[in-house]
Structures are given as structure tokens and as C-alpha cells.
């Protein structure tokens, strides 16, 4: 098959797959607002208002474009929902093109000279992309106004562009693909941060393309550097840029005495001059790689510039104006999700610190100062008491991998893992009344008459008299594996590859929201006798049984790919 014929087939079948996806999602689209955040996203998109942190300005601007086509106010929700329909259909299109690119890279790829080879090649790409089209979770997101449909589109575009960059990496056009990737990465911040998750996979594409001999040291370094690039963009580049704008604004207004917004304008001018002279110098000195690196950072910031919409609309005092991020400092707090409870990934407080009181050595810690404009003085003033403003959790209740951290869910944690151990403090051991109460409580525990909520209430009431142990490391690992991974990830995964019980909200019981396979002996081990289900349960419209076939085919595909192209296997595993 000639290259021209291949392009015709690739484009024609790709757009046909797009049309199938568009018809599927368009004919099943939600006509109004659905549960959770969809109603807020519809309202904030249609009128360009400020939603909950961390915001999705590019998503909202696209939603406003779709809202323009509403024939009446009653149709606004439907038209904004169509944004997800088109985003998901384009995702399937780029997935088809991604599969054809990957198939061409396999070592045993044939030239497609015969009709049967061409049908097998393009047919497999169509089956793969349409299988994703009809999968449970993707279809669900494709028909309502949520950020995940467009975020998935960004993932698909980024990975496809990474493969196109690989094709032309050492040509004159190669760097243009890198700059487009950088721009879309910046753009993803205006939709959902999950777009950044393609960076490690794209980094490994670069490594395998440029280093033909793969060593253990080089492989590990490439993975670490790719992950570091992700963290630098997410945790350093963009927060530092916002912080620079915020500090410049306060400095030039409060210290120099300039009017409001002067610091923001000066900061923007400084950044412009940095890129202008940086690009001019590197071009003059023929520093090609450094010049490309500066351009890549510039394109990330250009994509991120959709965030300018948020303070513009916040200053317009829109009806929905959550947190009112009207200047650079407030925008940084909005980006950093400062309104939500702080969580620790590797080391931090457990939920048991609610029973322990403040840390005895350092009971208070500083909060972050919050600046607001004082129009009388023409300066920014701190409006909160930030010195020693926050209670510091008891350091005895800090631990590694604090999965059991939320004090609001203490009772559920203890129901799920195990109750916390406790002993009477030495100074109260002679109190007979207290001892009797605790002995009675322990008897009730032995009888099985105490649940997590009652245990939690007991610890709250008697915590001044008790030494209460923090959850063990193994309790945290158990919760992570069984609930966070098993129930909140693996269950969703299996909905798509083995089957789904129903669309009822799961309560960690055997009746609702579980994955099933359709194979009685397997389902009965986990969910009880499936033959005794009533007609309502059996006829639930969300009930699907795939008999593990997609799951088994996926495993076979992974094994096949690993055997024939281990490099491509690792790239796809990182992306997955």
C-alpha cells in the first residue's frame, strides 16, 4: 500500500469511527443537568462564572461557545452537554489514529499490500477505539458536562502528538511537535490536571528513540527525569509564576506606592523581557537545545494563560464567584486548593489526632496571610490573624502513608479496619468509676454490640482520660489496598472489562455497585447466590456481563506487545 493510499484509508476510517461515536453519544446525551458538579459546570460555563477551585477556565470558555447554539434558555444545559459529546467523539478519533501509529511500529508489521492485511490492520484499530467508545465509564462521562470528557481528549491528543513527535524527532519539523505538546500541556491546566500524566510516557518515547542501547541505569534515570518534569511543571513552574505575580503586586503597591494592578503589569513585562532576551541570546549563540527549552516553557505558559479568565470574571462580580480570586495572590490560593483540608501523601497526621488534642511542644502553627485591597489607603492589607492561627496536630499521631487521615470519617475507618487501642492514663488508673465504665465498654465490644460510630463517640467523650493509639501502618496499608485501590479503582476498572452489577450507589455491600462477570461460580464467591436475584436486579439497565472476555483479551494484548516490543509496552504501561 502506498503512503497516499494509507493516508486515505487512515483518514476515512478514522472519521467514520468518529461519526459512530458522535452518533452514539449524541443520541444518549443528558438533556438537562445531571448529578454532582455538572449543574455548576453548566452554569459557570454558560455565563463564564467562577466555579469551585481549582477551576477549569478553558473548559468553561468552550462550554460558553456551545451554549451560544442554545435555541432557548431551557436548551443551554443540553448544548453544554454536547461539548462532552464532541470531546469524547474526538477522543475516539485520536485513539484510532494512535492505534494505527502503534501498529506500524511493531517489528512484524507488514506492508499492507493485500486487502486482507489492510482489513486486519484498520479493523483492529477500529475495534480497539470503538471498544473504548462503548466502555462503561467513558460513555458515562461522554454524555454530561464534566471535565473528564475533555480531559480524556487532551490525554489522547498529547499521546498522539508524542507518537508524531517520535516520527519526526530528528527532522526540521520535530521541535514543532514538542512545542505543540508543551502548549497542550499548558492548556490542560484549564481543564483538569490529569493531562500532565502523559508526560512520563512522552519522556520515555524520547528516551527509546534517542538511546538505542537501553541500560538499567539509563532506563531508571529516564523514568525519574520524566517524572521530575511533570512535578516541575505542576508544583514549581506554574505555582511559582502565580506567586511571582502576587508578590510583585503587593511589593509595587505597598512598598513603591503604585496603584493596584501595577505589580501585575510589571511582572508580566519582566516575564516578557526574560523570554524575549533569552530567545534572542540563544539564537545568536546558536544554542539550539536551550532555545527549544525556553520556547517549550513559553508555550506551556501560553496554554496556561486561559487562567487569566478567572480573575477577569471574578472582578466582574459574577453571580457564582467562588472564593473571588480577583488578584494574583488570591488566584494562587485558588490554584493550590487552600480552601480544602490539607492532606499529606507520605507522612502526616492520622484521624486519631482528634482524640489527642494539640501537640504539647508546638500547639499552634502559622496560617498563610490573606491580602485584600484597602481602597481608602490604596494598599493591600492582611485581613486574617495568621500567626499561630492554626491548631497543630499531635506529633504522636503522625505516621507514614497516612491513608486513614480524615477525622470526619473516624467511625467508618474503624468499621473498615479495626478499632483503636487505648489505655487509661496513669493519673486516672485509681478512678474506680472510670475503670468500671471502661470494663463495661470492653464487654460490649466482646459481645459485638459496639459499632464504629459508638466507638468513636466513646473515644471522644473519654479521650482526656485515655492514651489512644494511632492507626497502625498495616491498617493504613489495608485501607489503601482494599478500599482506595480495590473499591475505588479496581471496581471501576472491572466495570469496563468484566461487567457491572447495577447503577445504584455502592455502600461496600454485596447488593449495589459491584463488578460482576456473568460467570456464576466467580460472582457467587464475592456476591452470594446470583440465582435468587429478583427481576428488578436482573433487568437493571446498567447491568452488563462480559464474562472476562475484554479483560482476557487485554492481558493477551499486553503479553503480545511485551514479547514483540518491550519498549512500546513500557510506554503504554506508563500511559495507562
Annotate the PLM regions.
Residues 1-24, 112-126, 269-302:
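Start-transfer (signal-anchor) and selected internal transmembrane alpha helices
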Residues 108, 115-119, 158-177, 206-214:
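Membrane-interface transmembrane helices that cradle and orient dolichyl/undecaprenyl
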Residues 166-167, 198-226, 231, 236-264, ...:
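Perimembrane helix-loop-helix junctions
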Residues 123-126, 161, 168-186, 215-228:
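Short hydrophobic alpha-helices at membrane interfaces in multi-pass membrane enzymes
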Residues 6-35, 132-134, 192, 230-235, ...:
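Transmembrane signal-anchor helices characteristic of membrane glycosylation enzymes that use polyprenol
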Residues 15, 82-114, 157-161, 552-559:
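Transmembrane-helix motifs of polytopic, lipid-linked glycan transferases
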Residues 29-41, 51-63, 78, 321-323, ...:
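Extracytoplasmic catalytic/substrate-binding loops of multi-pass membrane glycan-assembly enzymes
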Residues 57, 70-93, 97-98, 110-114, ...:
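Loop-to-helix entry region of an early transmembrane alpha helix in multi-pass inner-membrane enzymes
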